[in-house]
Regions:
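Short histidine-centered beta-strand/loop micro-motifs
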Residues: 45-46, 77-80, 115-118
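Hydrophobic pocket/interface hotspot
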Residues: 30, 34, 89, 106
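Short beta-strand/turn micro-motifs at beta-sheet edges
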Residues: 6-9, 74-79
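Alpha-helical elements of the RecA-like P-loop NTPase motor core of helicases
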Residues: 31-32, 100, 136
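Vicinal oxygen chelate
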Residues: 1-13, 16-25, 54-58, 77-161
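Core segments of cupin and vicinal oxygen chelate
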Residues: 11-12, 22-70
Length: 161
């Protein structure tokens, strides 16, 4: 994290992911959720060719690009790896304090039950968006090697209250 991968000479090839695209049943409801919880900013909201889509900026270099398409519903209630081509995304909290605040907001929205998993190099919580899409919020612990806690057997539930 934070280092470029596979440079050509001294040329960095990528900065980050520009956006993630997925289907929503109700774009207005989804926008409101991300605005309330993450302080998101809508930079594009378009209706064209029988569909509606938006760019929802949830953080620096982090844009969600959901589409509302009539007659097309997102998968609901599917287990991990059965949700389609995009199973989930993980949003990276700016700090431990930000992680705790976002956890509080997600619990208040009913999008998370408050449980947090310590995965060694990061804290992780799962949340559901208004379409029941399962996503994650993580906080990467400074100075902890990324390989720490990679095995599920090493993970533990932690109480942040």
């Amino acid at each position: 994290m934070g280092q470029s991968i596979a440079p050509i000479g001294s040329v960095q090839l990528l900065n980050d992911i520009h956006h993630l695209t997925f289907i929503t049943a109700d774009l207005g409801r989804l926008i409101t959720f991300y605005q309330r919880v993450f302080g998101a900013r809508v930079t594009v909201d378009l209706e064209e060719e029988g569909l509606r889509h938006a760019f929802i900026e949830v953080g620096p270099h982090t844009v969600l690009h959901p589409f509302q398409v009539p007659g097309l519903e997102p998968p609901v209630g599917q287990p991990m790896f059965h949700r389609g081509r995009l199973d989930h995304f993980a949003l990276n909290a700016a700090s431990e304090e930000a992680f705790r605040e976002l956890r509080r907001r997600l619990v208040a929205e009913g999008a998370n039950d408050g449980r947090v998993t310590d995965m060694g190099s990061l804290l992780n919580l799962s949340f559901a968006d208004p379409d029941q899409g399962r996503h994650e919020l993580v906080w990467v612990k400074p100075g902890v090697p990324v390989a720490a806690g990679l095995k599920r057997a090493e993970w533990k539930m932690v109480d942040l209250d």
